């Protein structure tokens, strides 16, 4: 697809004039976006032909509407990411609270287990004392 753009009132024309210092051009330049080439249609003066200015073909221009659409889509994508991150943060916070509760419960169970072991040890000591007494009684 070829696009015909007038040189007058274009930024590229002024940039080209700065590069060549002198030079006049009347006509059009045609950008072929498929081949990324530039064709000229019009009259050059001698100085303009000698300096052979290079036109940046690979640069692409975006309209304000296209930019706003891109910006809006980007903003929507970012808000989606923010909401998912917020939801994940909330889940992590809830899981952290659950872990703390489980740790507290585990500590309580550990303490009860220690108490049970202490009572069993006391019972074992009593039984040993009773065995010793029985042995003494039997030996008499």
Curated annotation (Swiss-Prot):
Pfam families named in the record: DUF16 (PF01519)
Family stated for the protein in its record: Belongs to the UPF0134 family.
Protein name in UniProt: UPF0134 protein MPN_094
């Amino acid at each position: 697809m070829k696009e015909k753009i007038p040189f007058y009132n274009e930024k590229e024309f002024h940039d080209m004039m700065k590069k060549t210092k002198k030079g006049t051009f009347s006509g059009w330049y045609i950008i072929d976006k498929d081949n990324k080439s530039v064709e000229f249609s019009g009259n050059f003066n001698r100085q303009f032909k000698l300096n052979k200015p290079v036109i940046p073909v690979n640069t692409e221009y975006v309209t304000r509407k296209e930019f706003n659409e891109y910006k809006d889509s980007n903003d929507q994508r970012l808000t989606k990411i923010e909401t998912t991150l917020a939801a994940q943060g909330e889940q992590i916070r809830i899981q952290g609270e659950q872990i703390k509760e489980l740790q507290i419960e585990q500590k309580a169970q550990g303490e009860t287990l220690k108490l049970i072991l202490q009572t069993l040890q006391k019972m074992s000591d009593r039984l040993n004392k009773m065995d010793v007494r029985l042995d003494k009684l039997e030996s008499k």
